[in-house]
From Swiss-Prot:
Job description of the protein: Endoribonuclease that initiates mRNA decay.
PANTHER family in alphabetical order: RIBONUCLEASE Y
Protein name (database record): Ribonuclease Y
Enzyme Commission identifier(s): 3.1.-.-
Gene Ontology CC annotations of this record: plasma membrane
Predominant cellular place of this UniProt entry's protein: membrane
Database matches in Pfam families: HD, KH_1, RNase_Y_N
Length: 524
């Protein structure tokens, strides 16, 4: 019995200890799991906080960069606004000054017109007086005939003829003097009117003159792009030059790449190609060839737009597409360092204004002025550009007045209309005025004047020669004993002809012969 009780106690104790161990183990396991969960949650919170901190720092960095970029753009914009405002104020001031000048010139022209009308009235009165005097002369002749018949044995016909001859001689002398005086007054008034017309035309237009060079500048976003433009071992530069025929210069100048070529059209094509490559961001030989082809299509649009813009600015309608394309091509050519299209527009505006002042058709004048140098962009022609342009435009049924003005503006054809004279004068003004011919240096001008004097010195009987008015007049002093008045006229013609054949000059040169003969005697 005692054994059974002990066995029971042992079993009971085992069960109790087992249960206690089970519950204690479960308690410790649950406690350990709760601790790990708390640690994981704390770690997660820490990670989130660190990520939030990094995000805030990154956000602050980007906000700072954006603010700096905005401030930079704002400064650039403010500077540009200031520059444009200054330029606008200058242009406004120039316009006001020119308006005042034009008002004064308009008043001068009106005064001149009134003077011409007064002179016309005086001339009409003079003609009326001449008619009255002629009637009086006939009456006097009749009376003299009657007197001669009564006091002389001469026949009436003989006496009448004698009187008529005397009176005709005297009348011719008086008429010659009157005509000479009227002619001088007309020349003087015409000179004043021509001067005012030219001044009005020149002052009513304004073109910025800039000498054309052989460089184009392309701005890039950063200097890092220069390495991509060069390519590995310079292969991209070689491919670009082979495709475009334009030299590309990559130097230390920040954010700038330079294109160099003597042909402005080719250089502009290359500039568009490079801009397309920079916009796409892909630069390699195949991409360069594709960009060059795409830029070629865009160049055709650029050329047509330039031609249409020139026609619109001059209000010239009805121009065939082929001619519009050639006009646009002139934008990418130069003459004496001056942009060819700008020069042609200037000639057109000058000719149009002068035609308006002289009551001629300004549309024909502007049309001829714009097209006068189109022969310089015609391909494969051996003719002088003026004649080549005239023949080319004849195919498009251009008016005869315009064709003659174009063909004659360099003296290779006879001028058949006043429009031709105006286009020639406008061309000379545009090329000869200061700032237009940037290629003509001071040293070149000195040599030109010296050559003109040497040409005149080579003729017999010449003592001295002087080039005056910047070469627009050559004054020649000759020996009075060896050169007569008639010989002086021939000498002036010969010198002018030799200058035309041997010298190059803008406009016309006046040759003046000065002949002086001195006779000396002494009273004793």
């Amino acid at each position: 019995m005692g054994i059974v009780i002990n066995l029971f106690l042992i079993i009971f104790a085992s069960v109790v200890f087992f249960a206690a161990g089970f519950f204690l183990g479960r308690f410790f396991l649950e406690r350990l799991g709760t601790t790990k969960v708390l640690e994981a949650e704390e770690r997660a919170v820490q990670i989130v906080q660190e990520a939030q901190k990094e995000a805030n720092e990154y956000k602050e960095l980007k906000v700072t960069e954006v603010n700096q970029e905005w401030k930079k753009k704002r400064r650039e914009f403010d500077q540009e606004v200031v520059i444009k405002n200054n330029k606008f104020n200058q242009l406004q001031k120039q316009v006001q000054q020119r308006e005042a000048q034009l008002k004064k010139q308009l008043q001068d022209v009106r005064d001149t017109e009134r003077k011409l009308q007064d002179q016309q009235k005086e001339l009409d009165q003079a003609m009326e007086t001449v008619g009255i005097r002629a009637t009086e002369l006939e009456r006097i002749i009749t009376e003299q005939n009657q007197r001669l018949e009564s006091i002389s044995n001469l026949q009436a016909d003989e006496a009448r003829q004698m009187l008529v001859d005397n009176m005709i001689t005297k009348a011719r002398e008086e008429a010659t003097e009157t005509i000479h005086k009227i002619h001088e007054e007309a020349e003087e008034n015409a000179g004043r009117l021509a001067e005012k017309t030219l001044l009005t035309a020149i002052q009513r237009i304004s073109f910025e003159q800039a000498t054309e060079n052989a460089l184009s500048v392309v701005h890039i976003q950063s200097d890092e792009l220069k390495g991509r433009i060069i390519g590995r071992e310079g292969r991209n530069i070689k491919a670009f030059e082979n495709a475009t025929g334009v030299d590309i210069i990559v130097d230390d100048t920040p954010e700038v790449v330079i294109l160099s070529c003597f042909d402005p059209l080719r250089r502009e094509h290359a500039k568009l190609t490079l801009k397309k490559l920079l916009a796409d961001g892909v630069i390699h030989p195949v991409a360069i060839e594709k960009a060059y082809l795409d830029a070629g299509k865009e160049m055709a649009d650029v050329i047509m737009s330039a031609g249409e813009e020139a026609l619109a600015s001059l209000q010239i309608p009805d121009m065939p597409a082929e001619i519009v394309r050639l006009i646009g091509t002139m934008k990418f050519h130069s003459v004496y360092g001056q942009n060819l299209l700008q020069h042609s527009r200037e000639v057109a505006m000058l000719a149009g204004i002068m035609a308006t002042e002289l009551k001629l058709d300004p549309r024909l004048a502007k049309r001829a002025g714009l097209l006068h140098d189109i022969g310089l962009v015609l391909p494969d022609t051996d003719q002088p550009h003026a004649l080549a342009a005239s023949e080319f435009l004849r195919k498009f049924k251009e008016s005869a007045v315009v064709l003659n003005a174009i063909a004659a503006h360099h003296g290779e054809a006879e001028k058949e209309s006043p429009i031709a004279e105006l286009v020639d004068a406008a061309n000379v003004i545009s090329l000869a005025r200061p700032g237009a011919r940037g290629a003509v240096t001071a040293d070149g001008n000195v040599k030109r004047l010296e050559s003109l004097e040497e040409i005149a010195k080579g003729f017999p009987g010449v003592l001295k020669t002087y080039a005056l008015q910047a070469g627009r007049e050559i004054r020649v002093i000759v020996e009075g004993d060896n050169v007569s008045d008639s010989q002086a006229d021939v000498l002036a013609h010969d010198i002018a002809h030799k200058i035309e054949s041997e010298a190059q000059y803008p406009g016309q040169i006046k040759v003046s012969i000065v002949r002086e003969r001195r006779s000396v005697a002494y009273a004793k």
